């Protein structure tokens, strides 16, 4: 696992603004449900995952700095694997050798009131919404912070489509918060999170 090196709040905020500008210019970009994001305090974004570029529209939608937790073996873009941790502080996780330092790093960010983004499916491979992993629920319950079910729509294969005369539609939808407490069951919260994500997605997803 590569240790994250988050840039300053200002630099990451500028990256968020730049992401919003880029998404707005290159795609028909829209955001729904932003009122569901807590105005302060830490929370966990739990989006579906269909393409390596999914963090870009999420960053654009939130703008404020986010700490991403992503599986290193699932990232297929070599430039992003090298650029993400250096520029923004993405935590790349080796799932075959998960280290205690990974958990400590995320805990540290939560204690600093950071927004955390974890893709519960853990992969972009396969069709449709896949089974959720337990990481989102684990960190939410451990810290008693809300989960924000999130839908990312329209990013699959988007890099190959950019540059054509037609601007593709890309949308980010934030669902209602799932509030957690220390007594909650991890599997129940995981199932509820995936159920709420599914509600936000198109029927033909």
What are these regions (language model features)?
Residues 28, 52, 100-103:
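Short, well-ordered alpha-helical scaffold segments within catalytic/effector domains
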Residues 34-38:
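Glycine-rich helix-loop-beta junction characteristic of Rossmann-like nucleotide cofactor-binding loops
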Residues 39-97:
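Catalytic core of membrane glycerolipid acyltransferases/transacylases, capturing the structured
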Residues 1-10, 41, 100-205:
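Non-catalytic C-terminal accessory region of glycerolipid acyltransferases
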């Amino acid at each position: 696992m590569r240790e994250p090196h988050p840039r300053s709040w200002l630099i990451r905020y500028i990256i968020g603004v730049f992401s919003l500008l880029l998404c707005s210019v290159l795609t028909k970009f829209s955001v729904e449900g932003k009122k569901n994001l807590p105005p302060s305090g830490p929370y966990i974004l739990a989006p579906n995952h269909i393409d390596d570029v999914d963090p870009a529209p999420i960053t654009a939608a939130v703008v404020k700095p986010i700490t991403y937790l992503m599986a290193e073996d699932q990232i297929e873009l070599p430039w992003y694997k090298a650029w993400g941790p250096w520029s923004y502080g993405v935590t790349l996780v080796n799932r075959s050798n998960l280290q205690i330092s990974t958990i400590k790093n995320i805990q540290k960010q939560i204690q600093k009131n950071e927004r955390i983004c974890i893709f519960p499916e853990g992969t972009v491979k396969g069709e449709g919404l896949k089974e959720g992993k337990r990481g989102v629920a684990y960190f939410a319950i451990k810290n008693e912070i809300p989960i924000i079910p999130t839908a990312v729509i329209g990013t699959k294969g988007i890099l190959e489509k950019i540059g054509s005369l037609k601007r593709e539609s890309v949308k980010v939808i934030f669902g209602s918060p799932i509030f957690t407490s220390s007594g909650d069951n991890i599997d129940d919260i995981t199932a509820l999170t995936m159920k709420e994500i599914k509600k936000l997605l198109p029927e033909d997803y």
